[in-house]
UniProtKB/Swiss-Prot annotation:
Keywords: Hydrolase, Nucleotide metabolism, Nucleotide-binding. It is an enzyme of class 3 (hydrolase). Its EC number is 3.5.4.13. This is dCTP deaminase. NCBIfam families: dCTP_deam (TIGR02274). It comes from Salmonella arizonae (strain ATCC BAA-731 / CDC346-86 / RSK2980).
Length: 193
């Protein structure tokens, strides 16, 4: 059962759930909290690699990822990031979220953006119990026109679902937590699997 708006506010008031900066009540809807786009992005560079062997030796996978991923792009206030048709880019939420070990979160993109061809998360929409940090967005433009994305715009909504009990291995306590405390548009760390 997902938390309703009253429960989300209560969990925030009690400090059981943290969203920084705290959203105003107008952005806490029936069962979701609106989140905004941050100013950090990462793209794929022009490259000549025919493929990346994701099950290859870890050092080769790491080197291939370094060749194709850009450095982090930090946009100044007021500037737009342009996502062209058929392009994938990483970005982050403006808000940082911390979940307790007995709560899982879900990120959904906005329907208004999906109707323009923008996928806000390609596959990874679960936010694990114990997560703390900004949420990386996996943008894909499946539409016909370039889209101008501006930091601060509403980009998605979070919902929260209590677990039957606290997780024994919440994300923030796992030794293999590759994206712990991320604040930027962190590239894939599949080579750490």
């Amino acid at each position: 059962m997902r938390l309703c708006d009253r429960d989300i506010e209560a969990w925030l008031d009690e400090g059981r759930l943290s969203i920084t900066p705290r959203p105003p009540v107008e952005r806490i809807n029936g069962a979701t909290v609106d989140v905004r786009l941050g100013n950090k992005f990462r793209t794929f560079r022009g490259h000549t690699a025919a493929f990346i062997d994701l099950s290859g030796p870890k050092d080769e996978v790491s080197a291939a990822l370094d060749r194709v991923m850009s450095d982090e792009i930090v946009l100044p206030d007021g500037e737009a990031f342009y996502l062209h048709p058929g392009e994938l880019a990483l970005a982050v939420t403006y808000e940082s979220v911390t979940l307790p070990p007995d709560l899982v979160g879900w990120l959904d993109g906005r329907s208004s953006l999906a109707r323009l061809g923008l996928m806000v998360h390609v596959t990874a929409h679960r936010i694990d119990p114990g997560w703390s940090g900004c949420i990386v967005l996996e943008f894909y433009n499946s539409g016909k026109l370039p889209l101008a994305l501006r930091p601060g715009m509403l980009i998605g909504a979070l919902s929260f679902e209590p677990l039957s009990g606290p997780a024994a291995r919440p994300y923030n306590r796992r030794q293999d937590a590759k994206y712990r405390d991320q604040q930027g548009a962190v590239a894939s760390r599949i080579d750490k699997d």
